[in-house]
Amino acid sequence: MKKAIYFFLILMLTASIQVGAQSLDGTWKGVLSVGSQKLTLILHVSEAERSAKLDVMEQGAKGLPLTVNVMENDSLNVAMTQIGLHYAGRLRNGVIEGTFSQNSFTTQLIFNKGEVVQKRPQEPKPPFPYRVENIQFENQSAKGTLSGTLTYPEGYKEGQKVSVVLMVTGSGPQNRDEELMGHKPFLVLADRLARHGIASLRYDDRGVGQSTGDFSSATTAALATDALAGIKYLRGLKKFSCVGILGHSEGGSIAYMLGAGGNADFIVSLAGPACKFDTLMMLQLNGLSKVQGAKEDVVHSVAETRQLLLSKDNSLWMKSALDMNFSKFLPLIKCPVMALSGSNDLNVPAEFNMLSLQNGLPHNSKNVIKIYPGLNHLFQHSPTGNPLDDVNIDETMSEEVMNDVCTWINKVTNNNH
């Protein structure tokens, strides 16, 4: 009997030690339900630094600093006052149970310990069968240095003339891999190009990564000068037979701008706006709101669209972008153009944008204008095109799109690969 009591006391003591050893420290994962949408929240807690940060996976937000009100024993109370966000929870049995609120919205939210493991099967891993160089080039007009990665084709030999593409990212500050939603589209695409005999240069946006400069004050026109500096750098190397530009989203519009100035030997535009930007934004706002549950249009005119956007973002970039009409550059382009879109692209609606291209581009038998069924703005297969789903899609970019891009570039540049 005494042995039984003694054994029971040992169990109780062990349990109490385990409970007492529970710690808020580490990475926690929770799923927030907002209507029909689900957001994956990652909470990073450091008891030693008494700090907490938040990632919102579907929105590509990382390291958002939280104000710590309480971090003691099993209790956690954090907030982000500027957006009215608040979370109060308690650690029980290895999970944090609590209440999430933002302004008038309140719901229960549970965090489980652990990282989010994302599958990215297309992402290349070293060692690579091609040469890669970290380089820098100067934008003299902006007094900035852009840092990037120059990737040579598989089997490249010094003195061999090959085609090269300058890769230009979409809107917002992005690194050379155009990293967003846990994907690295430009890394994946650069790898595919190299394996098809095509060199590429991708670079960090100004003020991002290893590039200098101030992104916050940059307009699309200013960012185009960065891309132009990249083209001049590539031509100055005297290693390449043809220098083209490949841009995604805003980068695709920059490709049209530089093509109109005769700066590129060929253009690949991946969902690049080729129309009036304010009209495009009206279609975008209504399309995105409907896929996320709205039953009616949120804006009914271009004027209303401009007013709504400027009330939320009064930056120099937004002001200038709303006045841009990218269709004016199209008639001036003399080089071959490959313009691609996905039918489920809600950011740059394909039918509307492609109509502008068909009407604006001069006839060129080498031009390709194509809409891929079922692809979203990132050229992933997506049933709805909802950007909130991007992070949960394993595919980074459609195999068909990447192969078509490589085949077309080799064809228009007479690169026999």
Question: What does each model-identified segment do?
Answer:
Residues 185, 216-237:
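Alpha/beta-hydrolase active-site loop
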Residues 229-286:
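Primarily recognizes the serine-hydrolase "nucleophile elbow" in alpha/beta-hydrolase
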Residues 333, 339-341:
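Short beta-strand/loop motif that positions the catalytic acidic residue
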Residues 22-91, 97-103, 122, 129-130, ...:
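Central antiparallel beta-sheet cores of small beta-barrel/beta-sandwich binding domains
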Residues 160-170:
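Short beta-strand element of the alpha/beta-hydrolase
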Residues 116-160:
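N-terminal cap/lid segment of alpha/beta-hydrolase-fold proteins
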Residues 335, 346-360:
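Short alpha-helix in the alpha/beta-hydrolase fold that links the catalytic acid
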Residues 262-332, 347:
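Accessory cap/linker subdomain of secreted extracellular hydrolases
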